[in-house]
Amino acid sequence: MIVKNASKAVAALAATLTLTTLLGCAHPAGSQAEANYVDIGLIAFNDFHGNLEPPHIAVPIRSQRGVERVPAGGAAYLASAIAQLKARHPHHAVITAGDMVSASPLVSALFLDEPTIEAVNHMQIDFSAVGNHEFDRGWQELLRLQQGGCEKFTVREPCQISKPFEGAKFRFLAANTVREDGQPLLPATGIKRFTQGNATVAVGFIGMTLKATPTMVSPAGVKGLRFEDEAATANALVPQLRAQGADVIVVAIHEGGYTDAKVLEQECSGINGDIVPILERLDPSVDVVVSGHTHQAYVCDYGRINPARPFLLTSAGQYGALLTEVSLRVDTATRQVVRKTAHNHIVQGEAFTGSQGLVPLNAAVPAYPADPFVQQLVARYKAAAEPLAQRPVGRASAPLLRVRNEALESALGNLVADAQLLATRAPEDGGAQLSFMNPGGLRADLVPDEQGLVRYGQLYAVQPFGNQLVIKTFTGAQIRAVLEQQFASGGNTVQRPRVLSVSSGFSYRYDLSQPAGARISHMVLNGAPVTDLQSVRVVMSSFLDSGGDNFTVLTQGQDRRVGELDLDALEAYFRLQSPVAPPATNRITRVVPAAR
């Protein structure tokens, strides 16, 4: 049975029943039939992003009572879930598909994600593909996370709690990340062998990030590296793994897709995204592709889309809320996988109260006890971060959310853009007139407590990257070109646009029915039309300043000036403007032509 997303109770129950049936039908120990096969379990997750504490994610499930919500995630519960799945599969491997660290909540990020590495060490995983966020603090810091030590590569101090920091006991894999001299930054592959009786089966793993990683991180973080084509890299490594005895090939890749298949449909209907062209060129002898990056949850039999490439394609969403279980049966005579199934399981955590009210534990979904070691580890780091995390910074009159309207504008994005403008508007601070904020830089919603208080840890969760503000002068024509790049630059397309938030006082319209270069109109700044020759001072993050998210025009501009950290600007905004109300989402208008 192939289940797309067990974030539905029916899927979770079906997964449990399937496993029970398989175990119940196992051949008696020592039988000839059993001796011909080795059963292997793969356990996978992705995009954990240092969410050590339960991330207050509510996974929707369907029941006889309608749609219910299940609280999911938390490292202590994830560790327990992994342990239970390991117990089901005597032969097992645990892997991740990248973005284990960075863009993390304060309890991990304040300590350079060392606590996340320590928690995952306790889970005893085997391999982790690198993702783009592993490079946020630079490749040298990534190597420190692997190797351990206290050498300082960032503005934050390493080894604040663990002295010394031992590093990852699992292996990061970075097959398509190569130094200028052609040497790999990290290992490309790994092999794990399983012996049963006289038979040994080897599983080969290829791990890699997406080729577009340099467009998503600071150029300084990947200086001296190149990121090669994903499919070509994997295809070149498959015969090498075969030569080393690998019977099964698993690709863990930090790239993903989207699918609109119903929860119990055993197909990949509507699958799209950047993973698809990679799959279409991938060696068909690959057995499983564990993906990530899009934060989507799916389990797909890709062979139903393209019979020539019968991969299992999986992704476990984000933040440790889901865990993927893959079951493989290998014929020891032919060395072939003769059966493979996959399921996503909800990692039910603990009840919480969010912007939509109480999310209680759900008896229809398996619950996991908190792993005591991980629970104590998280508590130790939380106590160290608590004074800073709990410091009040201001008030909000209502939740500030990333939910986007039809024009892809959000209240939280507008607020952050306004905060950047306020911090740099004065002539002595850069003289900014307009602010841009990329949606990917907003990592959490901002929900005040019952008294309306907002705390520093919440601001950090929204903007955890530590970008500096950069102010430059652009012409009106360049600003128009920037906005055009929302729909036609690299991965920014009409099908998957990346719409920037803009500050108060600026507005424009876009029409996706028009050709590229003619989609932006009616640009207005402070009540006056923006002309092509007009000069405008624009503030943005250092990430956008370096051309991040495919906004290459933003690398241009004149009279560059560097301001304060984005997080400091947001904190100052709350200090000066409290109580803060959600800004209106009426700055951007999407023009939809009338049907003929």
Each model region followed by its residue ranges:
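Acidic/histidine-rich, surface-exposed loop or edge segments in extracytoplasmic proteins
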Residues: 49-66, 392-404, 463-465, 547-555
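Hard-cation-handling environments
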Residues: 337-454
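Generic amphipathic alpha-helical segments used as scaffolds and interaction surfaces in large
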Residues: 65, 69, 129, 225, ...
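Feature captures C-terminal
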Residues: 36-41, 51, 160-191, 302-312, ...
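Alpha-helix initiation and N-capping motif
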Residues: 75, 113, 139, 275, ...
